Amino acid sequence: VNADSAIEYWENVDDVKQILLYMESIADPKRFRTLASRTTKKKPILALKAGRSAAGASAASSHTGSLAGADKAADALLKQSGVIREFSLQDLFNTAKVFSHCPIPKGNRVAIVTNSGGPGIMATDAVCEHGMEMAPLSDQPKEALRSFLPAAASVKNPVDMIASAPLEHYKKTLETVLADDGVDMVVVIYLPFLGLKDIDVAKAVMEIRAAHPDKPIVGVFMTKNEFFAHLSETQVNVPFFMFAEQAVEGLARLNQQRLWRKRTDTPAPRYSVDTEAVEAVFKQAAADNREQLTTGESLQVLTAYGIRVCRDGEAKDADEAVALADKIGYPVVMKLNSKKI
C-alpha cells in the first residue's frame, strides 16, 4: 500500500479527520498530486518524507525497491498538493494534536495571554517568524483588562498578567481576548506560581475553549512532566505544549491549511512547445550514443519549451570569442561546448 492508495481510501471517510503519512518515495507524482490536491481541500494531510540526505535517499531506495528521487522535487510536489510536510515524528504528532483539537482559524492574527514576560516574548518572535500577525487589541478589551488586572500588568498583546495572576485573572483575561473580533487564535502561557496549580489553569482554559469553539486555543505550560502525564488520562479539547515555539508552530500549520483552502482551483498554464526541435536534439544525442546533452543542446531544449535563457553564441577561436562577447555585452562567461567532454 502506497501513499496514493491511502489517500484515495481515506479521502471520503468522514470519521477520518486528518491523514498522517510516512513516505520514502512518491511512485506516481501525477496521481499523488491529483489525489492529494483534492483531499487537502477537505482535510489536512501531514507527511513525514524521509530520505532528505543523499545517504538517506540511497537507503530508502534499497529498502523500498523504488527510487526515492530528489528531495527538492518531492518538497515542491508536497507544497503544490497542499500537503503539510514535517521533518520529525515529534513534529508530525504535535501538528496532528493541534488539528485534533482546533478549528481552522478565520485569519492569522494571534493573541498571547501569559503570566511571564519572557515566554510571551519568545511566543511573539515565533508568531512573527511564521509570517502571522500579533493581533492589535482594540480599546474596549484593553479597558476591560485594566479594570481587573494589576497596574504592573501589560494589556497590550502579549497580555502579561504578571507572575502572581490568580486563576480568576486567567479566566477573565482569556474570555476578554477571545471576545475581540480582531483575534483569530490565542496562545495561553502558564509558568508555575505558588498557590496556583497547573491542572486547575488547564481545566479553566478547556472550559472556556468549549464555550468558544470557533477560535483555536493552544496552551504552553512550562511545568513538570507529571502535568502532561495527568492530561493523558483526561478528556482534553486544547493542545498543551511545554514550549512556546511548539505551540506557535501548530498555529502556523492551522494557518497554512487555511491559506490552502482559500486558494482557487485554476487550470495550470499550458505552453506551446517546439516538439520537433526537442526531438531532433535527443535523436542526435542517441545517435551519438551520448547520455548527456551539450550546453548548446540544453539551451536549444529550454528555448523550445519557451524558457528564457541567456544570450549565447559559439566561437571557435579567440578572435571570434572577443567579437561575440562584444556583441552580447559584458559581463560574459565562457563554457566548453563538446560532445566528448
Per-region residue spans from a language model:
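Catalytic-core regions of core metabolic enzymes
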Residues: 1-341
